[in-house]
């Protein structure tokens, strides 16, 4: 694990909140839109930070769903390997 990336990814309070929401109930799968509503934060801000978490490996793409000519993406926390658990 790249600890520098992990530390940098967790320096923003919104990223921590996103990770906390995704961790509820042993892991949830949510779209940035759903996270935005739950966190009462603008979608553009949530989407930016979800992409940063995705790039750092702290969340993973769980699926896609077509919505009105666009594609809604859903994210979750990656599963821990037995060595990490």
Residue ranges of model-derived segments:
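Short helix-capping/hinge SLiMs at alpha-helix to coil transitions
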Residues: 23-27
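Short, cationic-aromatic polyanion-contact patches
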Residues: 6-14, 31, 62-85
């Amino acid at each position: 694990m790249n600890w520098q990336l992990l530390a940098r990814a967790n320096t923003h309070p919104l990223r921590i909140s996103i990770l906390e929401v995704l961790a509820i109930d042993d892991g949830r799968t949510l779209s940035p839109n759903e996270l935005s509503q739950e966190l009462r934060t603008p979608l553009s801000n949530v989407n930016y930070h979800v992409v940063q978490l995705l790039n750092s490996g702290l969340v993973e793409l769980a699926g896609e769903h077509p919505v009105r000519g666009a594609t809604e993406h859903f994210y979750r926390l990656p599963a821990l390997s037995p060595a990490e658990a």
